């Protein structure tokens, strides 16, 4: 039940109820299947000692959660970690703060959920107080934090009064990294806000979603139309068939805060384009609301224009390039150096596309227009500004679309990449890059690694820095002549192999540097997943669940891997130690 985030209680738990809640129903099932258990449970147990009361259920959940947390803190073992935090309201409008810790154990990066805290105020001081309370409860220290990762909200990221600054006052080594995945999303949003035509395009996409997805009937029409067209192309042999192919599609609504949502929406629009146009025609002809008819007519005109097809394919390509980066950034074990490398690669791809991608893009656009009977433009004709047709522009359509549209959007996208990912050029990451095992440790630089120790004064004293200087020379010679270190893809693999070869014992100071690089956060995707679990546990039907019970349920639902390792004996021991009981939990 905890593993599946299932509810415990039932709406009606009386004897006449047909379903008395999952917890009691499960006990009934076990009782019916096991005669020994049946003799000592529910009605066959003393009335004051049945061990099924709501308070008992909460205590059992609390014990499971405590055993999960115990495992996590044993893995951390008083070592350094990074702090990932975000806040969101639950179904009952309570502000809940998720706390995730990122740490290294046995050379492997772990991101673990350690608590859901109800905060009555979301200012930085309140959030810090809540974090300190949680840390004291679990015997953690702010001094052990070596990285901070939050979203871009003002109450989190403010230079002077944000949570980042408050923690930095107490611990100068708790370096802040703005969520890379969130920054990537902001790159897309920023261009949409700054470029008039791109902004207009996404505004029209939103209007299209409102019209096409406004009712179940219209959504069904899109699916049915798509199904018919798939059957046609299968019949003509134009597409392959097989398991997982040609599945039912539907349009997805994009959102500024949902990573990758714009890309999925545009991709689906290309796949479902004729079906979407059919629905718009239906709305215009059949709908009794004149406003909806006008809106559908305007959307038809816009999306069947060359301009809209141009921006559809341009933004689809840009988002397609960044989608791989977005997916990679959301991995729990992603390390900061690999993330920086991926950001640089993505930026280079965009720069290359700006240099030689226009002709290829134009071919795709022309093919799409021909397939869907959309009028194209002669690229060699003089461009006519639709806003002022009498004014002569003296430029061709090709010049307009290549230089004033394509190049402008690409330049803005590339510029936003540089502005948003300013951490990439920071001295801290430049020094950390010297740890990279790529190409036989070609970036190895002892001076940068010695400089890196100065960023962490609490982790290296003067004697250790002197020792490290000599240790680095032996380390690089050793790993460059060891085949096991020859083809490593990043510092995550380097940490794992150092543990496997026990070189972390031979070069403990180098391994300490490596851990500091690995714990630095990349993205807050794990935090977002915790909020998703919270919404499963505390739903509209379970909106009165108390904070402690919610916290225990969410911990178990998120950390399924650890929950599977918790034994019944551990839980029973914890249960008996909580308070004096009339009887033991057997």
Regions found by a protein language model. Give the residues of each.
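Alpha-helical structural modules in large enzymes and assemblies
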Residues: 1-586
């Amino acid at each position: 039940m905890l593993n599946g985030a299932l509810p415990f209680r039932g709406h009606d738990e009386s004897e006449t109820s047909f379903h008395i809640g999952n917890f009691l129903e499960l006990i009934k099932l076990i009782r019916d299947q096991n005669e020994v258990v049946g003799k000592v449970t529910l009605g066959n147990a003393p009335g004051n000692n049945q061990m099924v009361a709501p308070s008992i259920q909460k205590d059992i959940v609390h014990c499971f959660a405590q055993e999960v947390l115990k495992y996590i803190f044993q893995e951390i073992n008083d070592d350094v970690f990074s702090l990932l935090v975000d806040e969101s309201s639950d179904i009952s409008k309570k502000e809940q703060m998720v706390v995730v810790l990122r740490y290294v154990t046995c050379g492997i990066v772990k991101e673990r959920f350690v608590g859901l805290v109800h905060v009555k105020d979301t200012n930085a001081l309140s959030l810090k107080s809540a974090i300190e309370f949680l840390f004291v409860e679990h015997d953690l220290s702010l001094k052990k934090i070596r990285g901070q990762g939050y979203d871009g909200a003002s109450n989190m990221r403010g230079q002077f009064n944000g949570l980042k600054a408050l923690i930095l006052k107490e611990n100068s080594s708790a370096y802040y990294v703005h969520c890379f995945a969130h920054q990537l999303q902001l790159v897309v949003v920023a261009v949409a806000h700054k470029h008039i035509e791109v902004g207009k395009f996404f505004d029209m996409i939103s209007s299209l979603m409102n019209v096409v997805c406004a009712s179940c009937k219209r959504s069904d029409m899109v699916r049915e139309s798509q199904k018919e067209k798939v059957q046609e192309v299968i019949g003509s042999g134009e597409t392959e068939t097989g398991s997982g192919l040609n599945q039912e599609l539907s349009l997805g609504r994009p959102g500024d805060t949902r990573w990758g949502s714009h890309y999925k929406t545009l991709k689906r629009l290309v796949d479902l384009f004729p079906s979407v146009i059919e629905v718009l025609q239906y709305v215009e002809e059949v709908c009794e609301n004149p406003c909806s008819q006008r809106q559908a007519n305007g959307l038809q005109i816009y999306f069947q224009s060359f301009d809209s097809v141009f921006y559809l394919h341009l933004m689809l390509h840009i988002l397609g390039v960044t989608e791989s980066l977005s997916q990679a950034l959301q991995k729990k074990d992603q390390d900061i150096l690999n993330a920086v490398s991926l950001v640089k690669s993505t930026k280079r791809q965009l720069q290359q596309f700006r240099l030689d991608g226009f002709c290829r893009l134009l071919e795709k656009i022309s093919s799409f227009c021909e397939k869907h009977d959309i009028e194209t433009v002669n690229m060699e004709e003089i461009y006519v500004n639709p806003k002022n047709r009498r004014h002569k522009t003296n430029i061709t359509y090709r010049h307009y679309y290549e230089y004033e549209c394509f190049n402008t959007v690409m330049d803005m996208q590339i510029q936003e990449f540089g502005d948003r990912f300013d951490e990439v050029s920071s001295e801290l990451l430049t020094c950390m890059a010297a740890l990279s095992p790529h190409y036989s440790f070609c970036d190895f630089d002892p001076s940068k690694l010695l400089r890196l120790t100065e960023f962490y004064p609490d982790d290296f004293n003067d004697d250790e820095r002197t020792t490290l200087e000599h240790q680095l020379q032996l380390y690089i010679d050793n790993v460059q002549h060891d085949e096991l270190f020859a083809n490593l893809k990043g510092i995550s693999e380097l940490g794992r192999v150092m543990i496997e070869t026990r070189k972390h014992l031979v070069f403990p100071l180098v391994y300490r540097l490596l851990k500091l690089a690995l714990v630095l956060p990349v993205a807050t995707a794990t935090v977002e997943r915790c909020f998703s679990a919270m919404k499963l546990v505390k739903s509209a039907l379970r909106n009165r669940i108390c904070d402690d019970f919610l916290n225990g349920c969410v911990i178990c639902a998120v950390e399924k891997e650890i929950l599977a390792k918790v034994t019944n004996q551990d839980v029973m021991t914890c249960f008996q130690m909580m308070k004096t009981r009339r009887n033991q939990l057997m």
